[in-house]
């Protein structure tokens, strides 16, 4: 019988999901994106060759896998064409193996313009978006005014709808934000130039997935960003605009929630965050700088430096609760090699002195919160590219075990390097 496995970030994104999805896709027939857009940056290194995928599921690098983009994804035609071009130039047949829901909202130039205008207006209080129009596109979806992939089938009606919505956006851009209007004709021409390519890949994603379940096929759901960036359960308002948690799988793909068999939460051996928002264990000293240097902590999409800190078990507990995480995959374990001591945040000290073991929901409630640490001895031995768990240093194993104890979730996979072979699978999600 086939399994449906969800791979999602359990922290603030950038946990290394792309590599793990790629690793597990040799067991799957379908790989599905169900939320987010091209603000995701999934980096894969295979035989030394680096690939960064932003929109197309990571399974595209496996010849026997069909990739699906579900209705929960906001789709940029220009980003899709660029990514397809890059892959096809390397001999990867994207058009025969990628299927797209007609219900995907489209990201168009006016969304990007609005994203930039709003961030600029917020100044120092900016959310720290990627500036790719993700939020405005989701707004249009909820407001029921957005254009969707299915609208591309009727070009005449699309042109009319585009005119109306562009008038709406340009009025705000010009009169409120005092920036240039978005050109209607260029926007229309650019979309129409690729419309037939996109509509040629349209399919009923929900029907495909439900048929796959009946046929006993393995399905892998590829999450983007991280659980603590979820629009509802993250550190609002410093969040993304979609449901990054496991609940987004059902609503963003059309497969019912009872058909999810395993939720694999990806965690770094430490924590990182990009952009604004609370980060209790953030380090501002030389240790934080060393983690950033060794971990090469720069965003795959934006190139922005990531904030670094110790592992936060308190925040992870909320991610476990919201996602029903079955097992962890711990990545970048090797980054902690060489430290005299390592720390795990096991509680939050509130401004009134009370120590709690749960994370606040709203960003404002994190103000003045201090981490309560357990300090453990570090390890000097090298764990980079180790592929046998018995070869890991004792202190490293103790660190992993302690994280399992304080979270109540087993570590199913360990990653000690960027390549897909630099991995230890302790519990296979498709056979567990």
Swiss-Prot record:
Pathway of action: Purine metabolism; AMP biosynthesis via de novo pathway; AMP from IMP: step 1/2
Location of the protein in the cell: Cytoplasm
Molecular function per GO: adenylosuccinate synthase activity; GTP binding; magnesium ion binding
Keyword GTP-binding applies: yes
Binding site for GTP: 13-19, 41-43, 306, 332-334, 415-417
Oligomer status and interactors: Homodimer.
Organism expressing this protein natively: Mannheimia succiniciproducens (strain KCTC 0769BP / MBEL55E)
An individual GO BP term: IMP metabolic process
Protein name per UniProt: Adenylosuccinate synthetase
UniProt xrefs under Pfam families: Adenylsucc_synt
Annotated binding of substrate, by residue: 300-306
Assigned keywords, A-Z: Cytoplasm, GTP-binding, Ligase, Magnesium, Metal-binding, Nucleotide-binding, Purine biosynthesis
Reactions mediated catalytically: IMP + L-aspartate + GTP = N(6)-(1,2-dicarboxyethyl)-AMP + GDP + phosphate + 2 H(+)
Residues noted as binding IMP in the record, renumbered to the chain: 14-17, 39-42, 130, 144, 225, 240, 304
EC number: 6.3.4.4
Keyword flag tRNA processing: no
Cofactor(s) required for function per UniProt: Mg(2+)
SUPFAM superfamilies in the cross-refs: P-loop containing nucleoside triphosphate hydrolases
């Amino acid at each position: 019988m086939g399994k449906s496995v969800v791979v999602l970030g359990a922290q603030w994104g950038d946990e290394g999901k792309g590599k793990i999805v790629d690793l597990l896709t040799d067991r799957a027939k379908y790989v599905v994106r169900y939320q987010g857009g091209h603000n995701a940056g999934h980096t894969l290194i295979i035989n030394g060759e680096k690939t960064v995928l932003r929109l197309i599921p990571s399974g595209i690098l496996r010849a026997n896998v069909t990739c699906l983009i579900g209705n929960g994804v906001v789709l940029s035609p220009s980003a899709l064409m660029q990514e397809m071009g890059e892959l096809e130039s390397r001999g990867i047949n994207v058009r025969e193996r990628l299927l797209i829901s007609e219900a995907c909202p489209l990201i168009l130039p006016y969304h990007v313009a609005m994203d930039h205008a709003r961030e600029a207006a917020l100044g120092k209080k900016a959310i720290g978006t990627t500036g790719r129009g993700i939020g405005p596109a989701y707004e249009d979806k909820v407001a029921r005014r957005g254009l969707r992939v299915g609208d591309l089938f009727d070009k005449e009606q699309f042109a009319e709808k585009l005119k109306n919505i562009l008038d709406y956006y340009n009025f705000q851009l010009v009169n409120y934000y005092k920036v240039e209007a978005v050109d209607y004709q260029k926007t229309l021409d650019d979309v129409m130039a690729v419309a037939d390519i996109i509509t040629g890949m349209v399919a009923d994603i929900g029907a495909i997935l439900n048929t796959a379940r009946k046929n006993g096929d393995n399905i892998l759901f590829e999450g983007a960003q991280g659980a603590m960036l979820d629009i509802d359960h993250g550190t609002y308002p410093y969040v993304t605009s979609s449901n990054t948690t496991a609940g987004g799988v059902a609503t963003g793909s059309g497969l019912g929630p009872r058909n999810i068999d395993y939720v694999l939460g990806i965690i770094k051996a430490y924590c990182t965050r990009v952009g604004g928002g609370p980060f209790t264990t953030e380090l501002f000293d030389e240790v934080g700088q060393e983690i950033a240097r060794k971990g090469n902590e720069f965003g795959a999409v934006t190139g922005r430096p990531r904030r670094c800190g110790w592992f936060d078990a308190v925040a992870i507990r909320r991610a476990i609760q919201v996602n029903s995480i079955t097992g962890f995959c711990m990545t970048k374990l090797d980054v902690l090699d060489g430290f005299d001591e390592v720390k795990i945040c096991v509680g939050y000290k509130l401004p009134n002195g009370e120590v709690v073991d749960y994370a606040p929901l709203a960003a404002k409630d994190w103000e003045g919160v201090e981490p309560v640490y357990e300090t453990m001895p570090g390890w000097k031995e090298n764990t980079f590219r180790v592929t046998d768990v018995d070869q890991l240093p004792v202190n490293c194993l103790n660190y992993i075990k302690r994280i399992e104890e304080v979270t109540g979730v087993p570590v199913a996979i360990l990653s000690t390097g960027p390549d897909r072979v630099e991995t230890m699978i302790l519990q296979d999600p498709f056979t567990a």
